């Protein structure tokens, strides 16, 4: 891959962090979005922005710029609503696709509808190259090295987040969370998320957790076919995110209602956390793989979740530049492979927590 990547939604909060991180690595991009003036501001701000395209990526007629061999970095969520047409175009013409989604249904949809053609056309579709789900998937890859590939009984992730400051895109995604199905894995099948209270976690330094629907559950199902899998927020008195939202509802795919929510949201100015606030965003992440009677745990503690997302996207773009050799709909851990494991062990954002596995 020698041509610049397309950043979709380039004037969004996280997209601009990605653009800045790409500049640090001398990676060029073309800014894509619906608003000409906002795109012009991006091009003025970032010397590594080498072009702009005004397009609404929900409409097939406006995305014919995506051609064979291109790399599309999609930062325009909510992805359940805005990404399907773009993904279909990428897979059909032979363009690679990355996004930063934290939504399950668009990921499940790609596995069901695009996996075969993506493999045939030698395309990589990599969802959730972000703090949510990519870190968990990489930690799963690391834990798998210790399991001798034994059959997995359960795969669980637990987030303890010290701040509830969110980007505008994350806020909007949460408002639309129940317009699509949410999932856990139960009895080796994807099942609707109907109950958020979880079992008491074992071998972990907290007592309660609440299920929240992150894409890592879909990745775990597709990669490993465990008997059970779920993602969680830790429930502790000092956790600002103990409320965890209400996701235990059946999906109601009402496009008109979603569009109305999006429009109302856009009519209000939203500001994401500034650099100081991002740096102060502390977190802990625990990943548990239960094989027979042994529990393999990987855990990290760190800060700056949005910067982690930007760093992961750049890592993925660099990996594409080196020409991928595995194709299809891939989880972040599958796509990055050893490069991702090396990055886990050498980055400025987090450190491993030592825990005993039983």
Give the label of every model feature segment:
Residues 5-25:
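N-terminal Rossmann NAD(P)H-binding glycine-rich loop of SDR-like oxidoreductase domains
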Residues 15, 145-358:
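C-terminal catalytic/substrate-binding lobe primarily of soluble NAD(P)-dependent oxidoreductases
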Residues 28-30:
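Short beta-strand element of Class I
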Residues 32-36:
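N-terminal Rossmann-fold cofactor-binding loop
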Residues 37-38, 42-109:
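NAD(P)H-binding glycine-rich loop region in Rossmannoid oxidoreductase-like domains
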Residues 101-123:
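Rossmann-fold NAD(P)-binding glycine/threonine-rich loop
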Residues 126-140, 144, 316:
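Short alpha-helices
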């Amino acid at each position: 891959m020698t041509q610049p990547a397309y950043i979709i939604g380039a004037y969004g909060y996280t997209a601009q962090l990605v653009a800045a991180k790409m500049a640090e690595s001398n990676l060029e991009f073309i800014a894509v979005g619906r608003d000409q003036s906002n795109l012009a501001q991006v091009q003025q701000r970032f010397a590594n922005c080498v072009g702009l395209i005004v397009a609404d990526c929900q409409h097939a007629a406006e995305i014919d710029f995506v051609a064979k061999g291109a790399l599309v970095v999609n930062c325009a969520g909510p992805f359940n609503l805005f990404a399907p047409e773009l993904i279909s175009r990428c897979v059909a013409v032979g363009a690679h696709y990355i996004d930063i989604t934290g939504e399950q249904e668009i990921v499940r949809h790609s596995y069901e509808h695009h996996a075969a053609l993506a493999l045939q056309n030698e395309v990589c579709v990599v969802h959730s190259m972000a703090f949510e789900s990519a870190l968990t998937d990489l930690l799963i890859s690391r834990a798998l090295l210790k399991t001798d590939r034994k059959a997995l009984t359960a795969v669980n992730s637990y987030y303890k987040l010290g701040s509830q400051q969110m980007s505008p895109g994350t806020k909007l995604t949460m408002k639309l969370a129940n317009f699509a199905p949410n999932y856990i894995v139960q009895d080796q099948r994807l099942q609707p998320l109907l109950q958020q209270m979880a079992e008491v976690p074992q071998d972990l330094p907290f007592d309660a957790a609440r299920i929240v629907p992150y894409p890592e559950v879909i990745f775990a199902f597709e990669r490993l076919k465990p008997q059970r899998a779920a993602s969680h927020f830790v429930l502790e008195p000092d956790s600002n995110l103990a409320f965890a939202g209400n996701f235990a509802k059946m999906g109601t795919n009402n496009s008109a209602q979603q569009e109305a929510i999006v429009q109302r949201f856009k009519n209000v100015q939203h500001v994401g956390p500034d650099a100081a606030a991002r740096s102060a965003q502390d977190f802990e992440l625990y990943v548990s793989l239960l094989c027979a009677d042994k529990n393999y745990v990987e855990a990290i503690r760190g800060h700056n979740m949005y910067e982690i997302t930007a760093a992961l996207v750049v890592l993925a773009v660099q990996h594409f530049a080196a020409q991928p050799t595995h194709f299809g709909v891939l989880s972040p851990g599958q796509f990055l492979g050893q490069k991702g494991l090396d990055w886990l062990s050498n980055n400025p954002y987090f450190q491993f927590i030592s825990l005993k596995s039983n």
